[in-house]
Amino acid sequence: MTCGSYCGGRAFSCASACGPRPGRCCISAAPYRGISCYRGLSGGFGSQSVCGAFRSGSCGRSFGYRSGGICGPSPPCITTVSVNESLLTPLNLEIDPNAQCVKHEEKEQIKCLNSKFAAFIDKVRFLEQQNKLLETKWQFYQNRKCCESNMEPLFEGYIEALRREAECVEADSGRLAAELNHAQESMEGYKKRYEEEVSLRATAENEFVALKKDVDCAYLRKSDLEANAEALTQETDFLRRMYDEETRILHSHISDTSIVVKMDNSRDLNMDCVVAEIKAQYDDIASRSRAEAESWYRTKCEEIKATVIRHGETLRRTREEINELNRMIQRLTAEIENAKCQNTKLEAAVTQSEQQGEAALADARCKLAELEGALQKAKQDMACLLKEYQEVMNSKLGLDVEITTYRRLLEGEEQRLCEGVGSVNVCVSSSRGGVVCGDLCVSGTAPAVNTRVCSAPCSGNVVVGTPNACAPCAGAGACSGGCKKC
């Protein structure tokens, strides 16, 4: 069994083996974190007991001391070991304790920077892909042929339709404005009538109150007068009846003078009954007069109430008409505002359409001008190309003529050399951009002396002549001194 403990940078180990097994050496090292045991000065201490075997102590690489003992008849004990206290003191390695934290922070920062760098790389790749995509789109749009479309008739038709709609809206707005004016005039008339009716109603109510007071007073006076008249009438009737009775009695008394009649002049009249009867009559008359007055008053009140109800109904109808007119005015005002807004929108749309049409027309004109310029340039380029082509064709024709002339000259020279003809002078003139004409003249019978070629631009002819004269120069006098004769 092996046990290890760390204390102050040193390690102590002890090993014991029990049983009949051979002794084994146990080497222990005292490691220090981050430092190899071979560079440190730390040492280890170990002890070993072997039962049934003996092995001498040995010193290992860990600077430990070992001792061996024999387990036999001796008591099982561990020998005393001396320890150097200086070895137990911690070593001053001058290492910053925050170095590990700093290294960890540096590693984290490096990881963060690596992550940011990877993100930047991904972003750069994405932007490169976007750039490639945009370049592809740009090339596609550059290579795509733009189709010419004549949009001017469409815009003109649309603008004309909008103008017709605007005219219809203007006509509707004029009609609605006239209707609004008519409705406002009607409303003013109804308002004046309503105000007049209100003032008339107030005047009528005041007159009704005054008349009611007068009627009440007149009714009371009439009742009093009727009662007085009734009483006076009854009293007059009563007095008349009394007078008639007395007159009749007197006449009968006068007519019967010869007859002595014993009369009882004590008029035995029951005045209480007469008064009670008259009072009853007066009460009856008063009650009938009161009933008639009440019935008349109720009739008048009913008539006045009916008049008030009729005027109230008329006023209610007038108010309903006024409210209806107000609602109509509000509706017409809203319709007019809506028509104005729609007219404004249509005018704005017409203006915008006109602007867009003008812009499209201007753009079309610019494009037409550009196309005309490009067409003119293409025509000029074509004319230049045709001119160059004509010049090239002329040059080709001249070269063909020269080649033909040279071939004839060579054939003639070969024939002359073969036949032994006299000397031949050759004068060649080339013309740039024109048709070259050549005159071939062979003369003389003398042996061949020399052959001369005049390559100067004399008159545009290729001439073969005698050695005495250059035919083109002699004929026209236009040689520039290129030939020897001239």
Swiss-Prot record:
Region (Head): 1-106
UniProt crosslink position (Glycyl lysine isopeptide (Lys-Gly) (interchain with G-Cter in SUMO1)): K212
GO cellular component terms listed in the entry, alphabetical order: keratin filament
Region of interest called Tail, as start-end residue ranges on this chain: 414-486
Region (Coil 1B): 152-252
InterPro entries xrefs: Growth_fac_rcpt_cys_sf (IPR009030), IF_conserved (IPR018039), IF_rod_dom (IPR039008), Keratin_2_head (IPR032444), Keratin_II (IPR003054)
Record domain IF rod: where: 106-417
Annotated spans, Coil 1A: 107-141
Keyword Ubl conjugation tagged: yes
Record's miscellaneous remark: There are two types of hair/microfibrillar keratin, I (acidic) and II (neutral to basic).
Oligomeric and partner information: Heterotetramer of two type I and two type II keratins.
Name of the protein this chain belongs to: Keratin, type II cuticular Hb6
